Amino acid sequence: MIEPLPTEDIPKQSVSIVGIASRCAPHKLGADELEAIARRHYSSTPSLEKMLEINRKTRIDHRYSVFSSDHEHWHRPTIPSFSECDSLFKEYGIPLASAASARAIQDWGGVPDEITHLVAVTCTNTAHPGFDSVLCRKLGLKCNVRRVLLHGIGCGGGISAMRVAHELLLGSTQQGVPARALIVACEVPTVFARSELDIMDKTQDVNVAMCLFGDCAAALVLSNGIGHKASEQRPIWNILNCEPTQFDGTEDIAHFNVHDKGYHAIIDKRIPQLTGKCVPAGFQSLISSTPSLALEEKNYVPSNYGWAVHPGGYAVLVAAQDALGLTADDLRASYDAYRDGGNTISTTIIRILEKLRDEHKHGSNQKDKLVLAAIGHGITLETAILTRPGSSSYLHA
């Protein structure tokens, strides 16, 4: 019979965020630039004019692209093939991911060969081996780093990756061994912009995806705290819990489908309405599944928390704000990330965390606990709850 460990020998079950960085693509893509690209290649049609009207009203100041305005990608007469899109991701996306990762590692204060786990996520590439394999070599990670590559989860991918890394590091804690996880999200949707325009011209179905998505990479470093060194940053946030919720009857609401020229985004106009229903329900599920919070009624009040909501679009943020009874200031970092960059898919939630971290560094008064929420394909809502070091509910729930 195996004797249980004495309580004092059970490792403290906490996983912390100790490094954050993002790297948006170098070129700005404004509403005027997209309109010029569209009119260069296509004649006026009702669907094109409607898309361009939406494009002027997104409330996005600019998005980012790996392509400059004079790049061949925007001017060539033919649509890039799926194979060419794959090559473009490798040429432009992987350096973005490498830069964001290097900055996150620098922010953490450790060295690459101390990374024990790598959790990568993208929905804009499907190569084998995945970009995580290339990234290991570029960053100088150990050959036996535990790698996971996530795909097929869309805008929820940043929180999904955090959830997976969190659970992996808790496993290392149970073994009593040091663990540091690098989370990397990389999205280059403007690679598929030409094919998206072409599909819209052929089908005459208005596609708002053309107006929302931008290119970015972002990274986090997580630590289980075992073997902490003086050079390592102290925890920025501790992860209390992560909770995914898949909603029945929503399978046709959001897709990112494969076709012969790349990916085609389908974004249903019902998404803001669904956000207003899904996010409060997911929040209640998150709190009820967090033992250190579940028993007190006050913990089910959304306004008692800070918030980072993925900006699927402006209407999505407004719907979440209204449904949760929050103010625009409560979601200021989400609105700021949307204005500066638009929807950068799985990377966006990490950009928002970076903004909140920087605010806190400059003396911003923030609540001790922070709720993250992002709707991905499925529809699946990914949520997480973080807490500042030193606040109550420190231990993993």
Curated annotation (Swiss-Prot):
Q: Which family does it belong to?
A: Belongs to the thiolase-like superfamily. Chalcone/stilbene synthases family.
Spell out the catalytic residues. 155, 377
| Protein name in UniProt | Acylalkylpyrone synthase csyB
Q: What is the effect of changing residue 377 to F/P?
A: Leads to complete loss of catalytic activity
Q: Which GO terms describe its biological process?
A: polyketide biosynthetic process
EC annotation from Swiss-Prot or TrEMBL: 2.3.1.-
The keyword Acyltransferase appears for this protein: yes
* Annotated organism of origin: Aspergillus oryzae (strain ATCC 42149 / RIB 40) (Yellow koji mold)
Key word Repressor present:
no
Q: Which PANTHER family match?
A: HYDROXYMETHYLGLUTARYL-COA SYNTHASE, TYPE III POLYKETIDE SYNTHASE A
Instruction: Name one molecular function that GO assigns to this entry.
Output: naringenin-chalcone synthase activity
Q: Which gene encodes it?
A: csyB
Where along the chain is substrate bound?
214-215
Query: Where along this sequence does the record place binding of CoA?
Result: 50-57, 267, 312-315
Q: Subunit comment for this entry? A: Homodimer.
Q: Where are the transmembrane segments?
A: none
Induction details: Expressed during 1-3 days of culture in DPY medium.
- Which UniProt key words apply to this protein? Acyltransferase, Transferase
Q: What is the effect of changing residue 265 to F/V?
A: Leads to almost complete loss of catalytic activity
